[in-house]
Each structure stands twice: as structure tokens, then as C-alpha cells.
């Protein structure tokens, strides 16, 4: 009787392979998702896509800007660094609504670039986590490719910014994440 119980209890046992973290691909054949590489590879196409569908910022602001590709020029009122989410406060001619901001370094928030582009769709990713990581990586590309080379500081107040980007509404402000930007 003991041998029957022992045989039944050991029947479900097998050899288990412990896979070290980061080496899963060598066992499954599936490469780990690299949001940085994906966004870097896609960046030029994303920029062209957003540029191709960007509407004039003053027209978009009048009709609601959430998730919209925009382009235009504006006067820089200030470079706000009071929080880690640095941004330019800008004045768009003909618009008297809430504050308009352009993200400008430090910490970026939102998914506006990902949501405004049509190069990649949710279905191109394995799950929501990868889709979210892709949005964050696109924001990082915007910082590296667009904002950081400008070395923005407080001296930009009063200058004109020309931009193309993706707009999102929230908290009484419209925030634009740039994919192209110049300051003169």
C-alpha cells in the first residue's frame, strides 16, 4: 500500500529547468521586447507620420486637441522647471483658452506621440505592458532627438518656438510633446 501511494505521489514529478532572468530567449526562441530599440528603429517613420497629419495648432486648440498631431509657432512665455516635468509655456496667436505647454525635458508624461502616430498599433505588441513601454520610449526619443540638442534654459522666454508634435489635454492645459522643434 505504501508503494502505491509513493508511486502515485511521484507520478506528477518531472525535471524542471530553472531559466536565469534575461536568458529566456535562449530557451523559448522569443526575443525579449526592447522598447528602446523598437522606438529608435521607428523614430523617423513616426516623425514623418505625425508631420504628414499635423494640423495647425491654433485651429486644433479651438476644436479640442486631445490625441492630435499639431504644428505651428508660438511665443515662449517661460521655461518652467518647478517640477521634474519641464515645459515651455507658450502663447499661441488667436487662442485664449487654457495654458499651452510644450514638454521640454526632465520627466515626460503621457502617450500623445504613441497615440497620434499610425506606424504601430496595439496589435503589434504582445500586451499592454509592451504598448506602454513603447509610449515611454517614444517620449525618450523626443527628448534625445529633439529637446536635448536645444539646451533649453530660461533665456528662451520671449523667443519663438516652431514645432510639430502630438497634443494631449488634461489638468486645464494642452500639453504638446514635440517630434520636431526649433527656437529662434
Question: What kind of feature is each model-predicted range?
Answer:
Residues 1-13:
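Sec-dependent bacterial lipoprotein signal peptides
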